[in-house]
C-alpha cells in the first residue's frame, strides 16, 4: 500500500483523523519498506515517481560513499542492505518530500553519520534487551497496579526508551502502513485507553528480541485504564518478526525458562544488521489484525501475547477488516468456543499485549477473517471497519466474553497442536538453505516456542502435546496443503460446510515448519526489492514447531514443489513483491465429498453483490453506492481473500482495491454476457448491463445515474493503467489470465463437466492461499496437443489422452490440479472426491487491448516454469498491442495504446499462448471469411491458364491440400540474382558460381567466370580463389509456409490464412482456422475482433502531406462519382465508388547526395557543391479489399529545398513510382480512363500542388519503365499487369500533367534536353553540365560519370598513341563548330561531356520531363520566385525576371525583345505572390528502416517473400508490411546464430534461444566501443575479445570466404553495423568499405537501368531504320 493511502485509510476508514501518535515522530504509514517501485505511492495505484527517484538516488549515494571506505567481499555483500537501511532512517527523519530534497542537496556525510549513529544505538539496545528476560519475567507486581490518574505510566523503570525516539526510522516494508502509536481513538465509554507506543519493529534490531517486551506485556495486561487519563507505555518491539509474525520470539524462551529453567534466545544476530526494509509490516496491532494466533489458528488461544497463562488479550482496532474477523479463543486451556459479536460503533483499541506483541500470525484478507452475515458476532472485539470495540477490562481470571451479546457463531476451538495452522512462506533457494542450516542447529534443542500460545503456561503434559503436534508425513507430502478455518457459518452470507473459505496451499510441499511467519520472495521475483534477511545461520529466529518429536518431520532438503503451479497475482500494499504466505495445516487431509449445489453460486453472488456499508463515506469509494439493487448488505463479504500482512491501513487498502477489482470483473461479465435477459446466474447481471450501456455513452461528470461515475472511473483507470503492479488492474488481468490457464490445463479425452451451470471457478488472487471467484460458464474443452511450430508442416502430434483428475483443495473453489487433495468439512471429517470436469470459457464480446508502453514488461503464461515459482512470466514487449483473449465470460474494455504496442498474451484452452491478431481472419465476420475463401480460389492476378490449372487442382484435393485454397504445393518466386562483375541478371535455371557469405556473397555468370584465365577473380578490390567457388543452378524453390489449426488440426497455407508468423511466438501461438472460427462465431462462442485489434494503414501517423493528398483525392472521387451518376441517370448511392482508401507517408528522412568524384573534378574551380541535402519521402496508397488493407501504389520523391545549393534549389525529383493492378472497383470514369488511373493521377497532382504551395519551383520525372522481371517498389507484379513501354508510360505522365496544367498547378512543360542542352529562342543561358539538376538515381549523373571515365581513358590512350577502344574522341574543332568558344582546361571537358551526354539523351529526350511549377526566365532560364515577372502580351510564353529586365533596358531598342525583329514589344510587370520564402517542411521526421530506400523495401519483400503477384499474396504481404511499419524495432529478417546455426526468431529481442549470452544489439554496441578503445586493460565486457577478432582479421589467411569461423562472426557483425551506421567518419573497421559495397550495389542497379534504357533506344532506332 502506498503512503498516501495508508494515512488516508487509517483515519478515514476508522471514522477518525489519521493518527500520528507514533514513536520518534515518524509519520503514519511510510512506505520505506516497500519495494522501491512500490514506494511513495499516492492515490489509487499512482506512484510519486519523483520521490521514488530521490530515495533511490540517496541510496546510491550512500552505497557509493560507504563503498569507498570498505572493500572486503563480505562487507560489499551486505552493503546494499546497509545502504537501504540507512536511507530508511533518513527517510524517517525527513518524511516530507521537500525536506527530503533539501537534505539531499546538502552533503551526505553528516546525514550518514546520524543514520549510522542511530543504527548503532539500536543494535546496542538489541544486545541489551537480550539480557532482560529474567528481569522482566520476575517483575510481576507492576502489572497489578492501577495507574494513577494524570500520571503517565511507563512499562518499566528502565530508561532505555531514549532509543525509541531514534530507532523508529527503519520500519520494514509495509511497516508504515499502520499508525505506530496504538492510540487510534477514544473508547466508546469516554475513557482514554492506554497507548502503547511501539517503535516500528522494523529493521532496527534495537528492539528487544528476547524477554523484555514479554514481561511488560503481562504487566500492561493487568493494568486498568483510568478514566479520562492517558496511560502511555513505551515498549520496544522485537524486529525479527516484524514481517508479519508480530509477536515476541523471545516469549517461548521465557516460558521455557519459567518451566524448565532453560533459555533459548531468539535473536543472536545483533552484531549484524538484519531485516533491512524487507518486512511486511511492523505495527504490532496490525500484526494482530491478521491473525488469531501466533501460528495461524483461526480461533486459537492468545494468552498474554505469547502463551502466558492468565494473561488476557484485547485485539487491536481493525479499520479495514470489513471482510475479516479475528478469531480469539478463550484464555487458558478452556475448550469453550469464543463468542463473537459485532456492533456498529467506531473501532478503538485498549492497550493489551496485542499492541506490543501482535501475537497472531498474519493472514491474508479473509483467511482468519471468516466471512459471516450481518449479525455474526465475535467475542469482545469488533474488528470490521464499521464496528467499534467496547471498552473492556480483562484480568487473568476472566475469559473473553461479549459485552453486547448478539446472535453467535460458535467456533470450533482448535486447542490441539494437530489442528494448528502453521504459516510458512515461499522461500528463495538461498533462503531455504540458510534456514535449513538454522533449523539444523536447533533441532536437537527442546522447542517450546511459539506453539505455547495454544498451551498452558506450565505445559503439564509436554509429551502428549508433542505427540499431538507431530505432523503426519502424508500431510506434509501433499502437493496441496491447506490451512482452512474450520468454522461453520450460518447461511446468511456464509458458505455451507462443503465449501469453506480457506487459503490455497503453498506450492512448497516440503518446506520445514518455521516459527511464525517471515517474509520471502517468490523464486522468480527474488531479484527485485523485497525482504532482505540477515544471516539466518547466526539467528535463532526460526525454530521448529512445538515439540522434540516434530524434529523428525523436518525434511533435510527443502525443495521447491511445482505441483500447484498456480499463478499468484500481486496486491499493492502486500509483501514486497507479494511474498506469498502459505498456511500449513498439520492435519491429515483427505478428500471430502462435495455436492453440486448452488452454494458456490451464492458465494459468487455474495462476492459480487454484497457491498459492506460504512458510516464514513470516505472509507470506501464503492460502499453504499456500489451496491447493486437487491444485494444483501452484510458486515463482511463472504469470500474475500485474505489480506496479506500489512496492518490496519494495508488491510483497508487491499479491501479497497479488492472491491474495485471485483466490481471491474462484474462489469466485464455484464459487458460480455451472452445469456438471454433474466437467465444469467448473476441475477443482477441485467441491471449491471444497463449500467454499462449507460456509462459507456455518458459524458456527464456529475451524472446521478446509479454507480455511473464510479464505474466509469474504474474502467477509465483500467484503460489507462500501465502499472504492472497496480493492485486493481494487474490483478484483474491476471485473474482472467489464470482462468484461461486453468482451463487450458485440462486435457481430457472427452469433454468433462466441472460443475453445473452455477459452479464458479476459483482463481488464485495473488497471495499464496487466497482465492477469488471468477465465473466460468459451462462449455467443452477440446483435446489439446503439444504445440507444433507453425512454419513447417510436420508430422501431426496426437492429442494427449491422459486422463486428468481434478483436485479439490481446501479452498471452496475448484483449483484444477493433477493430483487429489483433501477438503476437510466442518467436523474435520474427510471424504474422497473425484469428479469430471467441463469448462466453458466463453469468449469476449470485446477483447481488451492493454497497452504497457514501449519496452515494457507484461505478464504472460507458458508451460515450462521453474519449480517453486508462480507461472508469472515476463515477455518482451513488442510495439503493437494485441488484444487479450480471456477465454472466459469476463470481457475487458478496449484500450488502444496510441504509441506503439505491447503484446498481451493469455493461455488458450489448448495450452498455447492465445495471441490476438495472429491471423487477420479473426477480425472477419463469417460473410467476410466466405468472401475471402472464394477469392482465394479465383487466383486473382494469375494468367487465365494458371488460374484454371489451380482451380482444376482444387477439384481434386487430397488430405495434403490446403483447406482454404484447395491446392497442395505453391512456391515463391526466387529473388533475382545478378552477376557481380557485369551486373547482368542470372536467368532462371541457368548455372552460376558463387563465393562468400551474407552481404559479401558474390555471384558470377558463366561468361565472366570463363573470362578470367587465372586462378583468382577480382571483384570490388578483392581477389577470390576459383578453387573456393561453388557452382550452382538458379533453380531453388521455396515452398509456401503452412500453419495447422489447433482446433481441427487441418493445415492451411499461412498466406491463405492471413497468418502473421511474426506473432507466432516461436511456434507456440494458438491458431484457429477460418472454418473453425466461423463455426465458433455461429455458435456464439466468440465474436470477431474489432478492426482496431490489429493496427492497419489508418493507424499509421498522418502528416500534412498525406492529409493534403487524401483531402483532394476524396473530394475529386466524390465529384467523379456524381458525374458518373449523372451520366447514368442514377443516384450517387447506386453507382459504385472507390472506398477504403488510405494515403500515408511512411518515410520522411533527411539525406545528403554526394556528387560523384569525376564530375566534381571538372567543376571544382566553379565552387560546385560537394553534396546536396534533400528530404526523401515514401508515399503509399492502401485500399481495403475483402477485409484486408492492400498496398496498391507507392512512390519515392526527393525534395531539395530552398536551403540547397544551385542547381538543385527548390526542385523535386519523382524518383520511383509503382503500382499493382488490384484496385476496386474496376470501372471507368466519365472521361473513359480507368478509375484506378484517375486515383493515381490525383495522388500525383495533389503532391505537385503541395510542392507548389511549399515554394518548390519545378519537378523532374524520368519516365522509365522497369526492366522485365525487375521491380521498383512492390515485389513481383501480377501476370495480368503488363509492363508499359516507355512511350505509354510517358503518355501516362503527360496526361496527368495536362490535368494539373488546367488547374494552373503546372505552368510549363518541357524536357531536360530542350531546357539545358540547347539554346532556343532568346535564351542566353550557358550550356554547361553545372546547370543540370543533380538527383540521386537519375539517368544523367551516372551516365556522365561513365562518360568522364571513358573520355579520360581515351585521352590516356591517345597520349600513348594507341587506337581508342571506342569511337574517336571529340575534337576541339568539332566543339567550336558546335558553338563552344572556351575550350581551355575543364571548360573543354565540360563541353565535351555536354556534347556526348546530349547525343545520348536526345533520342529519348521526351522521357526526361521537366515540370515547372513557377515560371522560368526566357533569358537566363532561372525559375522566378520573387520580385516581378515581366510578361510580353504579344508573344506567347515570354517571361523574364527583374535581373534580365534591367539588363534588357540597357540594350539598344533593336537588340531588345523580340530579338532579330524591328518591332518592339512592351513588357508588363506581374508581381510574384503567394510563394513562401523557404520550403520548410511542417511534417516531422518519419524514419523507417524498411522504407529508407526503395531498394531496402525490395530487399525486405524479397527476403521474406512478400510478393504481390496474386491478390492472395498481396493481401498477406500488405498485412506483413503494416506489421513492420507498426513494429519498427522488430527484426526484419530471421537471423541465423553464427555459434549454433539456429535461427534467431523475430521478436525475440535479437537473442538466440540456444545461446543465451548472445545479444546482437549489445554486440553491435561493443563493436563500436572496441573500434575506438585504446585501453589495454579495458573493463568493458568482451572488449578485449573483439579487439582480438580485429587482430585476427588482419592476420587470417583463410578469411571468411575460406570458411574461417572467427572471420565469419566478425563479418556478420560488421555488415549489420554498416547497414545502420549513419556516421560518415565511423572508425569501425571496414565500415566505410561495407558502405561503399552497399553503394556499389545501388550503383549496379542504376547501371542496369541505364543499360536497359540504352538497349531499348538502340532497338527503337533499329526499328525506325528498318521501317525506312
UniProtKB/Swiss-Prot annotation:
ZnF segments: ZZ-type: 1412-1475
Q: Which residues bind Zn(2+) 2?
A: 1432, 1435, 1457, 1465
Q: Where are the zinc fingers (PHD-type)?
A: 1002-1079
GO MF assignments = chromatin DNA binding; histone acetyltransferase activity; transcription coactivator activity; zinc ion binding
The reaction(s) annotated as catalysed by this protein in its Swiss-Prot or TrEMBL entry are: L-lysyl-[protein] + acetyl-CoA = N(6)-acetyl-L-lysyl-[protein] + CoA + H(+)
**Where are the annotated coiled coils located?**
1342-1365, 1630-1650
Q: Could you state one GO cellular component term attached to this entry?
A: histone acetyltransferase complex
Q: Where is the composition biased (Polar residues)?
A: 11-23, 470-491, 536-551, 900-909
Q: What class of enzyme is it?
A: transferase
Residues that bind Zn(2+) 1, according to the entry? 1417, 1420, 1441, 1444
**Bias-annotated ranges (Basic and acidic residues):** 886-899
Keyword set for this entry? Answer: Activator, Acyltransferase, Chromatin regulator, Coiled coil, Metal-binding, Nucleus, Repeat, Transcription, Transcription regulation, Transferase, Zinc, Zinc-finger
EC number of the protein: 2.3.1.48
Its primary localisation, in coarse terms, equals nucleus
Q: What's the protein here called?
A: Probable histone acetyltransferase HAC-like 1
What organism is the protein native to?
Answer: Oryza sativa subsp. japonica
